[in-house]
Amino acid sequence: MAKVKDCPGFETFGVDVKEARKAKNLARKDLAEKVNIDTRYLANIENEGTIPRLPVIIQLVKICGLPMERYFNPEVMREESE
């Protein structure tokens, strides 16, 4: 699996997923079940900087309500925040 250091734009992905999960009052186990991944794998995404495969990214982004552009087009997000 790729790590954050290898994937520009994904520096905050794990933290974003974790914060969104908590904001939606979802237990890690519940989110992992919705995405059909192991709870430990989700913990690695949230805490260890593991970048999952694209289908998992898409599901996490949809369920958590995260903006896809933040990860795949980070320059646009930076320009909008300035």
Q: What are these model-predicted stretches?
A:
Residues 1-23:
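A short, Lys/Arg-rich alpha-helix, primarily the initiator
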Residues 15, 39, 54-58:
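Short alpha-helical elements of helix-turn-helix
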Residues 15-34, 59:
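Short basic helix-loop element that most often maps to the first helix and adjoining turn
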Residues 17, 31-32, 42-45, 71:
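Conserved hydrophobic/aromatic packing and binding residues within compact polymer-binding modules
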Residues 36-51:
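Recognition helix of helix-turn-helix/homeodomain-like DNA-binding domains
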Residues 49-62, 78:
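Short, basic-rich loop-to-helix N-cap that marks the start of a DNA-contacting helix
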